[in-house]
Amino acid sequence: MSSVNSRGSVTALRFGRLLLTGAAGGLGRELRTRLKGYCEKLRLSDIDDLGKAADGEELHVVALEDRAAMRSLLEGVDAVVHMGGVSVEGPFDPILQANIVGVYNLYEAARLAGVRRIVLASSNHVTGFYRQDQVVSPADPVRPDSYYGVSKAFGENLARFYFDRYGIETACLRIGSSFPEPRDRRMLATWLSYDDLERLVVACLSAPVVGFAVVYGLSDNRVRWWDNTGAMHLGFVPQDSSEPFRAALEAKQPSLDLDDPQVVFQGGAYVRMGPFE
């Protein structure tokens, strides 16, 4: 029987070698400490400095767009948690290289290495041009709000192809806003606590069957824009909520301009970013 740790995550899960890409990024740094207990070896990659390797860690400085290096990186890996790539909106070319070329390199390397499961960081910005008064499910058409959102929609479609063609299972996580606590009014609906992030990733790694799945990464917030019932088959049960932060956040937020696209659409500020050339 599986045991559960103090954060509500399954602890019986154990891989030989687990790869975490983007390990120097914000969520990567958080998951680096949390995933150690789920594998014999935790292989970490990023283009930025990863510091010193702790016991059981393997450090690799690798650019996602370097196809040969990615193939070497995936050798001997049992499963992948992909947090790498450009994580914000910006000019198209860097997003193209990291989030489109890079995710292709990841999946092709996984195919060659015989990897059977990937947890892929997608984004809520895949559906950012839905209104905040709408409830969206993964079954609804994508409506990306940015080049970044477009790149994440590509990643989901590529993952679908690699499952249908090669049987590589993927859980695509449309992550909301994962921080220690929500920072603004929008995040009251989109917040994903670090503990719930761990619960979600571990659920996706440990579920007996994933197939191809798209789920939203959010905590048990009172106000929600996303129908996440599809995550139930993965065993993800969020335990945190943004509600305890509501009063303090709303007290310091400016009055809402109901005509502001950042207030109208779920993508917030992303719907107004750019053009960049």
Predicted regions and their residues:
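Conserved Rossmann-fold NAD(P)-dependent oxidoreductase catalytic core, especially the SDR/UDP-sugar
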Residues: N105-R143
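Glycine-rich NAD(P)-binding loop of the Rossmann-fold in SDR/ketoreductase-type enzymes
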Residues: E65, P94-N105, A113, N124, ...
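NAD(P)H-binding glycine-rich loop region in Rossmannoid oxidoreductase-like domains
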Residues: G51, E57, V62-A98
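Conserved C-terminal active-site "lid" loop/helix of NAD(P)H-dependent oxidoreductases
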Residues: D220-V237, K252-F276
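Catalytic helix-loop patch of NAD(P)-dependent Rossmann-fold dehydrogenases
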Residues: Q97, R131-T170
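Alpha-helical substrate-binding/gating segment
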Residues: R174-E181, W191-F212, D220
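N-terminal Rossmann NAD(P)H-binding glycine-rich loop of SDR-like oxidoreductase domains
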Residues: F15-G37
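Conserved catalytic-site region of short-chain dehydrogenase/reductase
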Residues: E89, N124-D133, Y147, F179-E181
